[in-house]
């Protein structure tokens, strides 16, 4: 028991002892209290503040046994001796039929009423004390809110276990600010400067509105078997659309998470490869150059990793050829122990990661890894400062008039669906927003906090995208879908970013795997841990898929936009709009304008998906 709690209880005891008139009354107070004035206590409950075995007293002759509470008639009152004034009656006892005020006063003197009132307060106080902030026991399929919190330790929360608006806002911001941040300059280049910024802000508004529908939907349910305070969006879909709605929500939520695992694996392989290359090169005697600097296209410490002819040949075909060449040894085939043979970006490094990280995926509880959630906030801050420092170093390099200039900027581009698809996943928080807001100290501020969170995310995306785009000193077509690839491995700031992000992603990946298995296994088996064998099999399959993408299709931007457009169609556009229409129709508040507007949201999602394969 914490010291402050012991001191508080002792002070309460001293206060109540002062109000107990004599030893006899003190013994009476030690017996079991009535449940009429207490909070849901049976006849078998005992006061936890008293001794386990209170002394038993024999009842007075002809009186009511102490410790037993039964109604007495008016005819029996006169037969009770005078010492019966010390016997206990139910709290808030007002007498039965035929009792006059004089009889009631004879049963309860002023001292007795005061004493029993104090004991009732004591009993209620200790039954209402919160044992640590966990007011409700959540079912297994509901994710713990601290999974997304930026507070690394429970001690940083208040005594109620709740979090304020500032922590809630930054938890929303931290959850959305993911890997798509690295692809934002590339996505902006695909859409053009002006059109891209318009799409960024428009998608933020649409995704915020559908997320708002998600957080309001449990409140409008009337027949939900799960408590609305604990309901997930899949429960809402099940209530309105049956099992099909629940399975759609779960399946596409899992698809988003699997897409996140794949992108994480591609990026971790990239970061580990370049970090290892720098370490190896620095250990060589008389090393003055770093291999990636042989490109010789450095301008303002930025280089073009691929030629601008990337649209002339199928990109997947070129990458497949490169991956096979790397696994066969490439030009270093004559040297069987060459570092370049055993350290390849699309061959060996993703496999090394699989062996190194597989044990971390099989923990039953990921609580330990939630302590590192704050690293996400630090990494985002570092990237913001990193990009801003490059703007100061390189300056603004934009030319709106000369198409032949290397600084020429397109205001609009036909490849804008790459940006809209990426943003659908970038602004995706719909499967976690209810969990995050469940710990909110002031639920009435949920809409405000969600809107502020989306504004912060939109600002960061626009800032990263525009700043890097404006400062890029060569052709914009050279911008990589991971903008750290535009910096040599010898660049100190970019190398630090790679190493820091690698560690941060290693701590987040087990959380993603936990979310995948929790939602998937609960939908199939009704429990989040159906056995170690099933968990291991699922993790092996997921890692195999991730390694395959990292080897044969390591395109972060393309993976983001395809996963975002497919899963976003269902979870961001269709399901929230259909839930709103269904609930408004049941409440009688659905107007034709509202109906067509929400159907329009679904149409936007369909068009976004089709455009990924057309343009």
Curated annotation (Swiss-Prot):
Region of interest (Disordered), ranges: 41-65
Keyword annotations: Amino-acid transport, Disulfide bond, Endosome, Glycoprotein, Lysosome, Membrane, Metal-binding, Sodium, Transmembrane, Transmembrane helix, Transport
Alphabetical list of InterPro entries matching this protein: AA_transpt_TM
Regions that span the bilayer: 166-186, 193-213, 247-273, 342-358, 368-392, 414-434, 452-472, 492-512, 534-554, 562-582, 595-615
GO cellular component: late endosome membrane; lysosomal membrane
Biased composition (Acidic residues): 42-52
Family of the protein in this entry: Belongs to the amino acid/polyamine transporter 2 family. SLC38A9 subfamily.
Function summary: Lysosomal amino acid transporter involved in the activation of mTORC1 in response to amino acid levels. Probably acts as an amino acid sensor of the Rag GTPases and Ragulator complexes, 2 complexes involved in amino acid sensing and activation of mTORC1, a signaling complex promoting cell growth in response to growth factors, energy levels, and amino acids.
Name of the protein: Sodium-coupled neutral amino acid transporter 9 homolog
């Amino acid at each position: 028991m914490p010291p402050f709690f012991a001191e508080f209880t002792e002070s309460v005891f001293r206060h109540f002892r002062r109000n107990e008139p004599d030893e006899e009354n003190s013994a009476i107070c030690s017996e079991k209290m009535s449940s009429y004035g207490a909070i849901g206590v049976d006849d078998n409950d005992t006061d936890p503040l008293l001794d386990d075995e209170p002394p038993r007293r024999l009842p007075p002759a002809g009186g009511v046994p102490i410790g037993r509470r039964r109604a007495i008639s008016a005819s029996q009152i006169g037969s009770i001796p005078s010492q019966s004034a010390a016997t206990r009656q139910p709290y808030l006892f007002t007498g039965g039929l035929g009792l006059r005020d004089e009889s009631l006063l004879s049963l309860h003197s002023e001292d007795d009423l005061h004493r029993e009132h104090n004991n009732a307060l004591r009993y209620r106080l200790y039954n209402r004390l919160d044992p640590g902030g966990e007011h409700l026991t959540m079912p297994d399929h509901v994710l713990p809110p601290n999974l997304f919190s930026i507070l690394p330790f429970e001690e940083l929360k208040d005594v109620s276990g709740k979090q304020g608006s500032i922590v809630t806002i930054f938890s929303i911001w931290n959850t959305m600010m993911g890997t798509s941040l690295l692809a934002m300059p590339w996505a902006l280049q695909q859409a053009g400067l002006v059109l891209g910024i318009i799409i960024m802000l428009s998608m933020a508004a649409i995704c915020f509105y559908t997320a708002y529908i998600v957080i309001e939907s449990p409140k409008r349910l009337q027949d939900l078997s799960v408590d609305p305070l604990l309901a997930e969006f899949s429960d809402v879909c099940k209530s309105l659309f049956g099992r099909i709605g629940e399975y759609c929500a779960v399946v596409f939520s899992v698809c988003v998470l699997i897409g996140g695992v794949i992108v994480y694996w591609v990026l971790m392989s990239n970061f580990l490869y370049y970090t290892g290359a720098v370490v190896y090169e620095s250990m060589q005697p008389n090393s003055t150059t770093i291999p990636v600097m042989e490109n010789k296209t450095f301008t303002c410490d930025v280089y073009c990793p691929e030629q601008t002819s990337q649209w002339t040949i199928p990109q997947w075909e070129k990458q497949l050829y490169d991956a096979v060449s790397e696994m066969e040894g490439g030009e270093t085939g004559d040297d069987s122990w060459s570092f370049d043979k055993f350290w390849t970006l699309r061959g060996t490094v993703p496999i090394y990661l699989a062996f190194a990280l597989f044990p971390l995926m099989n923990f039953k509880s990921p609580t330990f890894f939630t302590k590192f959630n704050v690293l996400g906030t630090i990494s985002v801050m570092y990237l913001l400062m990193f990009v801003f420092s490059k703007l100061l170093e390189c300056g603004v390099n934009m030319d709106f008039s000369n198409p032949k200039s290397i600084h020429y900027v397109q205001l609009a581009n036909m490849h804008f669906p790459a940006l809209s698809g990426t943003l659908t996943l970038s602004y995706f928080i719909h499967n976690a927003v209810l969990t995050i807001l469940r710990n909110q100290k002031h639920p009435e501020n949920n809409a405000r906090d969600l809107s502020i969170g989306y504004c912060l995310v939109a600002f960061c995306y626009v800032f990263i995208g525009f700043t890097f785009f404006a400062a890029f000193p060569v052709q914009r077509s050279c911008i990589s879908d991971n903008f750290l690839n535009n910096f040599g491995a010898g660049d100190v700031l970019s190398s630090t970013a790679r190493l820091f992000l690698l560690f941060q992603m290693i701590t987040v990946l087990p959380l993603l795997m936990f979310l995948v298995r929790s939602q998937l296994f609960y939908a199939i088996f009704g429990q989040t841990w159906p056995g170690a064998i099933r968990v291991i099999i699922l993790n092996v399959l997921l890692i195999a898929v991730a390694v395959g993408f990292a080897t044969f299709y390591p395109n972060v931007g393309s993976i983001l936009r395809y996963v975002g457009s497919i899963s976003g169609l269902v979870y961001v556009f269709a399901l929230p709009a259909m839930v709103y229409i269904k609930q408004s129709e049941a409440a009688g508040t659905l107007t034709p304008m509202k109906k067509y507007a929400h159907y329009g949201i679904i149409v936007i999602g369909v068009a976004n998906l089709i455009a990924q394969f057309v343009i």
